[in-house]
Amino acid sequence: MNQVDTRKETLEFNKLQKRLRRNVGNAITDYNMIEEGDVVMACISGGKDSFAMLDILLNLQKAAPIKFEVVAVNLDQKQPGFPEHILPDYFETLNIPYYIVDKDTYSVVKEKVPEGKTTCGLCSRLRRGTLYSFAEKIGATKLALGHHMDDIVETMFLNMFHGSRLKAMPPKLRSDDGRNVVIRPLTYCREKDLIKYAEHKEFPIIPCNLCGSQENLQRQSIKAMLIDWDKKTPGRVEAIFKSIQNVSPSQLADRELFDFENLPLDREGNREEYEFSEAVVSSTNIDESMFIDVTNI
């Protein structure tokens, strides 16, 4: 590689790094993810996303206007062949506090899940419960997970297609027991950016042999759908994500979310909402391919 190529590659990476740091910083600010004095438990699986999250959090920590701690935690689920030395060695090079939590959830998953069935659901529940308990043990105030924008959009479609629910992943949530706050600092980051970032940083990626190789997973088909959309219509994934941020309960059909039964009439004839809707429709570039031809039905 000549000097011109090297200079160009460095420039592109610097732009990528700034974009990712800006996206993480904006997500943290928008959802008040990290506050003064927080102890952030960064959950590191060994995948590209959690490595990138840790790296960006540590960089933001140096320049943040508030003081907070970052503690790296890995859950060793006792998968056969798992390289136990990689993460401790990596954390040592960073000179940061870390813990390796030993919990044989692998055997439980293999015992409970029939052959050929997806293991991700039970695996994630067991992992989540263990991490919640450990966070309390070390006094962590926030649990940081490495889910990104693509994960959030994929989850929404998974719930729509296979659960008949309009539900995704929130950037910040309180656990069911009310004792933990989970944050997703990569909420505004695209997976394709994280892939490039991880390649350049040469993180010691550890593949998940328990579930990552199951190509027939429902999530994989949805991921492929989004990748195809990205190629044909750049920006569509971002637009879908923005729609998750801009919900109009009265324009859906959930009777628990909006009181359709007792819908009051506006006797004053206020047409502001209707006029706004008309303005939006008239000023929006509508993708005509999304319409259905009903003339021959």
UniProtKB/Swiss-Prot annotation:
Q: What class of enzyme is it?
A: transferase
- The short motif PP-loop motif is annotated over 45-50
Q: Which reaction does it catalyse?
A: cytidine(32) in tRNA + S-sulfanyl-L-cysteinyl-[cysteine desulfurase] + AH2 + ATP = 2-thiocytidine(32) in tRNA + L-cysteinyl-[cysteine desulfurase] + A + AMP + diphosphate + H(+)
Give the protein's cofactors. Mg(2+); [4Fe-4S] cluster
GO BP field: tRNA thio-modification
- Pathway assigned to this chain's UniProt record: tRNA modification
Q: Which CDD domains match?
A: TtcA-like
- What note does UniProt attach to the cofactor annotation? Binds 1 [4Fe-4S] cluster per subunit. The cluster is chelated by three Cys residues, the fourth Fe has a free coordination site that may bind a sulfur atom transferred from the persulfide of IscS.
The keyword tRNA-binding is annotated on this UniProt entry: yes
The protein's matches in Gene3D superfamilies, at most eight in alphabetical order, are given as:
HUPs
Q: Which SUPFAM superfamilies match?
A: Adenine nucleotide alpha hydrolases-like
Protein keywords: 4Fe-4S, ATP-binding, Cytoplasm, Iron, Iron-sulfur, Magnesium, Metal-binding, Nucleotide-binding, RNA-binding, Transferase, tRNA processing, tRNA-binding
Q: Where in the cell is it found?
A: Cytoplasm
| Protein function | Catalyzes the ATP-dependent 2-thiolation of cytidine in position 32 of tRNA, to form 2-thiocytidine (s(2)C32). The sulfur atoms are provided by the cysteine/cysteine desulfurase (IscS) system.
Give the free-text miscellaneous remark of the entry: The thiolation reaction likely consists of two steps: a first activation step by ATP to form an adenylated intermediate of the target base of tRNA, and a second nucleophilic substitution step of the sulfur (S) atom supplied by the hydrosulfide attached to the Fe-S cluster.
How this chain assembles, per its entry, is:
Homodimer.
In the record, the note on similarity to other proteins reads:
Belongs to the TtcA family.
Q: Supply the name of the protein.
A: tRNA-cytidine(32) 2-sulfurtransferase
Tell me what organism the protein belongs to. Vibrio campbellii (strain ATCC BAA-1116)
User: What phylogenetic lineage does the species belong to?
Assistant: Bacteria, Pseudomonadati, Pseudomonadota, Gammaproteobacteria, Vibrionales
